[in-house]
Structures are given as structure tokens and as C-alpha cells.
Amino acid sequence: MARIAGVDIPRDKRVEVALTYIYGIGLTRAKTILTKSDVNPDIRVKDLEDGDVQKLRTALEAFTIEGDLRRQEGMALKRLQDIGCLRGRRHRMSLPVRGQRTRTNARTRRGARKTVAGKKK
């Protein structure tokens, strides 16, 4: 396995697809990186030469990926929660943030059902 940006990317996949194993890189960004670094997207990772891998590493330095991106996203959520805006409060309460209904649905975001005792007659 080639190790790029601290991630072991699979050897048997095409470079274009293998780059998507890095957090923060999708197919479109992978294609952009490959064209900038002048690497053929159709070859397999195991067939890459050391020079090609080095080109990919230098091209990846221009993007925020992996741990830095995760930290940046976490800090953005924490900022929303600290300033007490609606989005931050909704994140804190594990409810949908973008205005979706919660009376029904929203089961994924709210988690498993919590049974509440019924009213006595």
C-alpha cells in the first residue's frame, strides 16, 4: 500500500479511486489533483513510480485534508455551539439543523426511540 497524507491507499485500485480514500478528497478533487500533477488516472497504485507519488503528495499539500479538515469542521461546530445560535443548539441537542420536521421522521438524527409513560386515565 502506498502511504499518502498519512493514509494507506489500496494498491489494486486505480489512482483516481484510491485517492478518494483520503478524507476530504472526492472523485472531482482527485481528478483535479491528477491533472495538476500530470499523473495518468487509469494506472493502478501499485504501478506508480516514486516520482509520481511525490508529485501527488506535493499536489495534496494545497488542500485541507484528513486531521486538519476534521479539526476545522469540529471547531466550526464548537463555535456555533459556543455563540448559542439556533444551529449550535440543534447540534447540541442532536436534532436536525436545517429546518426539517421532527414530530415524525428524523429518527436517524434523534437516535433510538425512548419510551415515555402514557397519561393515567
From Swiss-Prot:
This protein's GO CC annotations: cytosol; small ribosomal subunit
Molecular function per GO: rRNA binding; structural constituent of ribosome; tRNA binding
Coiled coil (residue ranges): none
Alphabetized UniProt keyword annotations: Ribonucleoprotein, Ribosomal protein, RNA-binding, rRNA-binding, tRNA-binding
Quaternary state and interactors: Part of the 30S ribosomal subunit. Forms a loose heterodimer with protein S19. Forms two bridges to the 50S subunit in the 70S ribosome.
Family note: Belongs to the universal ribosomal protein uS13 family.
Record's protein name: Small ribosomal subunit protein uS13
Species annotation: Prochlorococcus marinus (strain MIT 9313)
Lineage: Bacteria, Bacillati, Cyanobacteriota, Cyanophyceae, Synechococcales
Gene this chain is encoded by: rpsM
